[in-house]
Amino acid sequence: MAGAWKRRASLIVFAIVLFGSLFAFSIAKEEATKLGTVIGIDLGTTYSCVGVYKNGHVEIIANDQGNRITPSWVAFTDGERLIGEAAKNQAAVNPERTIFDVKRLIGRKFDDKEVQRDKKLVPYEIVNKDGKPYIQVKIKDGETKVFSPEEISAMILTKMKETAEAYLGKKIKDAVVTVPAYFNDAQRQATKDAGVIAGLNVARIINEPTAAAIAYGLDKKGGEKNILVFDLGGGTFDVSILTIDNGVFEVLATNGDTHLGGEDFDQRIMEYFIKLIKKKHGKDISKDNRALGKLRREAERAKRALSSQHQVRVEIESLFDGVDFSEPLTRARFEELNNDLFRKTMGPVKKAMEDAGLEKNQIDEIVLVGGSTRIPKVQQLLKDYFDGKEPNKGVNPDEAVAYGAAVQGGILSGEGGDETKDILLLDVAPLTLGIETVGGVMTKLIPRNTVIPTKKSQVFTTYQDQQTTVTISVFEGERSLTKDCRLLGKFDLTGIAPAPRGTPQIEVTFEVDANGILNVKAEDKASGKSEKITITNDKGRLSQEEIERMVKEAEEFAEEDKKVKERIDARNSLETYVYNMRNQINDKDKLADKLESDEKEKIETATKEALEWLDDNQSAEKEDYDEKLKEVEAVCNPIITAVYQRSGGAPGGASEESNEDDDSHDEL
C-alpha cells in the first residue's frame, strides 16, 4: 500500500510533465488521420525485425526467406547490392565489400575510441569524412564509393519496409523506429535521417527497452508493477526500470552501454582461436579477411549453441592454406573468455536501481530482451544480483522490441483501437541538459531521467554593462563545470537593449520532444527578440565512453566539483558586490547625491583595488575571495549605513541587495 501511495505522490510531482505527455499523445491521435499504416521496426546492430498492428493484434512479419528476423548486413558484388541473409551468406568470399555492425558507427565521430577499435576489427574500410566515419567500398565495375552509416542503415530499413509492404500488399511510408535507450541526440537524429533516406516518415523514435516493456505489459491488467528490462543485443546494452499501471508505462531510470553486446562475445572467441592457430600452426590469420569471415560466422554459431549445450566443435573447411580447422569449445571456456564483459553488464543495473530509488525486492519482474540474454551466465549473474529471482521469459527476446514498436505504431495510426487506447508512454531523457553561465558553470535545466516530452524555462541575465549580445552554449553531461561536459551547440541572441549588467531578462527554454531530441530557444523579455536551435547530429555528440566517463567522474569527483563551484560562486559574489557598489555611488537616484566627497572617494578606492585584485588573482581560492569581500564590505557598509541614517531611510548595505536570491538570475 505504501508503495502505491509513493507512486501516486510521484505521479502528482510529474503532473505538469504528464500533462505535456498527454497533450503530445492527444496531438499524435489528432495526427492519426494524416498517417497511414504505421509499421514498427527494430533496427538492430546484428539483426532487424518488423511488425504491424493489424486486426487487434501484432503481426511480426517474416521476410522473403521465411525468417522473422533479418541480418543487418549489406554487401556489394560486381552485379548487385545484397541485403539481409543474401549479404551475410556470401561474406566469407567477399569480406571487404560486406558491411555489418553499422549501428556501432551511426551518430559517432571518426575519432571516437570505439570507432577506431571497430576499424581494426571489421574487414571493410572505414574512412574519415568531415570528422565522421564513412564506409568506403567497391561497388560494381570497380567504382569506389563512400557511404555514411545513415545510408547503410537506410538500406536495411528499406529491406524491412519492403518486407512489410509484401505482407500488407500496399505501400508503407510511416514507421516507428527503435533505438537503444542510451543513444544520445546525435545517434537519434542520425537514425531519423536513415529513415528519411529509406523513404520513411519516422513518426516516432522510441527506446528499445521501453518498446519491450510494452510487449510484456500490453495484456497486463490490474495493479502497479515495477519491471526491469535487461536488453543485451548484438551491439548495444540497455537497462530500463519502468512502472506499469493499467496501460501507463512510466520509465523511472535508464542506463547502459552503446558499445557492448553479442558481437563483442564473438570477437573474444575469434581472438582465442586466432592465438590457438598461431600456436599450433605458426600462422597468423588476423589480417586474412577471408579466414576471419569464416571464423566470425562459426564463432557466432558456437556461441548460440553453447546457450543450450556444454560443448561444441568449431569446424571450418579450408580455413587457410588448405588447412581444415577443427577445435572444441566448452561453455566454461566461453564464459572465462567473456567473464569481464558479462560482469560489466551489472554496473548499469546497479546505477539504474539507484537512480530509480528502488530496492531489489521492489522489482516485480525482470524482462529479458535481445539474443544475448539467452546466455546462461548472463541470466545467472542477473539472478544472483536479484537474490535468486528468476527472470521472466514470457517475451521473445528477438521480437519483443519490434512488437512494442508495432503497438506504438497502432496507437499513432489509430489502428490500435480500443486495445491500445489506454496506453500512455512516459519515457526519459538519458543525460542532463543545460547551458553555460559565468565562470564556466553548467547550469542544469533538464536533469537526467526526466520524463519526456518535457519543457523547462529559466531566466538569465547579462554579465556586463551595456551588453547587447549573449551566447547560449548548450551542454550535456553530469559534471558541474562545462569543461567536463560536452558542447552540443551554441547560438547568439543579439539586439538586447543596452542596460546595466543584471538588468535584461533572457528566458532560455529547453524542450525535449517525444523522440528525445532537443530544441533550445532564448528570448529577450523586453524586446521579444528570440533565437532558437535544434541540436542535430552535426554538432559532435557524445560517444558512449564519454557518457560513462562523465557519469563516473561526476561520482568520483563530486567533492572536487563542489569546491570549484564554490570558488566560482565566491568570485561572482565579490564581483557582483563591487559592481553594485560602483553603480550605486554613480546613480543619482541611489547614492550619488547623498555621499560626502571623502565617502565616495573611499568607496571608489576600495572597489578599484578590489577589481585590480580580481584581475591579478584569477585562480584564487574561495577563502581568498570571501576575505576580500569582507575587506570591501568593511569599508563600504559603514558608509552606506551612515548615509541611510542621515537620510532617515532604512539601513541596508549593497551586500544584502546583492545576496537576495528572489530576483537574482545566473549571468550569461
From Swiss-Prot:
Residue ranges, annotated region (Disordered): 645-668
GO MF annotation terms: ATP binding; ATP hydrolysis activity; ATP-dependent protein folding chaperone; heat shock protein binding; protein folding chaperone
InterPro entries: ATPase_NBD (IPR043129), BIP_NBD (IPR042050), Heat_shock_70_CS (IPR018181), HSP70_C_sf (IPR029048), HSP70_peptide-bd_sf (IPR029047), Hsp_70_fam (IPR013126)
Residues carrying a glycan: 617
GO cellular component: cytoplasm; endoplasmic reticulum chaperone complex; endoplasmic reticulum lumen; membrane; nucleus
Alphabetized UniProt keyword annotations: ATP-binding, Endoplasmic reticulum, Glycoprotein, Nucleotide-binding, Signal
Position of sequence motif Prevents secretion from ER: 665-668
Superkingdom of this protein's organism: Eukaryota
GO BP terms in the entry: chaperone cofactor-dependent protein refolding; endoplasmic reticulum unfolded protein response; ERAD pathway; protein refolding
Leader sequence segment: 1-24
Keyword Flavoprotein: no
Location, primary (coarse class): endoplasmic reticulum
Compositionally biased residues, Acidic residues: 657-668
Matching Pfam families: HSP70
Subcellular location: Endoplasmic reticulum lumen
Function of the molecule: Probably plays a role in facilitating the assembly of multimeric protein complexes inside the ER.
Family under the similarity heading: Belongs to the heat shock protein 70 family.
Protein name, as recorded: Luminal-binding protein 5
Organism: Nicotiana tabacum
Gene: BIP5
